[in-house]
């Protein structure tokens, strides 16, 4: 069985990046397949949020090893740790900004975004041949 992990939260520090919501990519150079899975999820998330109250735009994403998204710089994140597990399919972080995130961030809009995020997660898992059909 494969396990998927998403860390959802507001960032621990405020920088210019934190005016939008975005994904932090995996920082595990020993597992190149994670980048393809992260890319697929981002495509699905972009599609799932299109037309919603809070639209995800991958241009704000920070790949692993870039900017503050470096294990050497911030220590081992929960996602980097999870990606070392043998049954870990993929883990990454979605940061919710301190700004408007492309629209007014309300409780209802946050819930809508969460539902759309889960839709993208399921679609990502369904398109990966390494995931067994019997887990559904």
Describe the function of each predicted region:
Residues 1-136:
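Structured catalytic-domain cores with a bias toward divalent-metal coordination
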């Amino acid at each position: 069985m494969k396990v998927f992990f998403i860390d959802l939260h507001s960032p621990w520090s405020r920088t210019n990046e934190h005016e939008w919501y975005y994904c932090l990519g995996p920082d595990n150079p020993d597992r190149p397949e994670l980048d393809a899975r992260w890319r697929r999820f981002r495509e699905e998330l972009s599609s799932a949020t299109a037309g919603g109250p809070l639209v995800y735009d991958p241009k704000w994403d920070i790949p692993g090893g870039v900017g503050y998204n470096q294990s050497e710089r911030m220590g081992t994140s929960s996602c980097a740790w999870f990606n070392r597990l043998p049954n870990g399919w993929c883990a990454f972080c979605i940061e919710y900004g301190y700004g408007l995130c492309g629209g007014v961030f309300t409780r209802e809009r946050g819930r809508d975004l969460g539902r759309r995020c889960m839709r993208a997660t399921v679609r990502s898992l369904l398109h990966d041949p390494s995931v067994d059909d019997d887990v559904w």
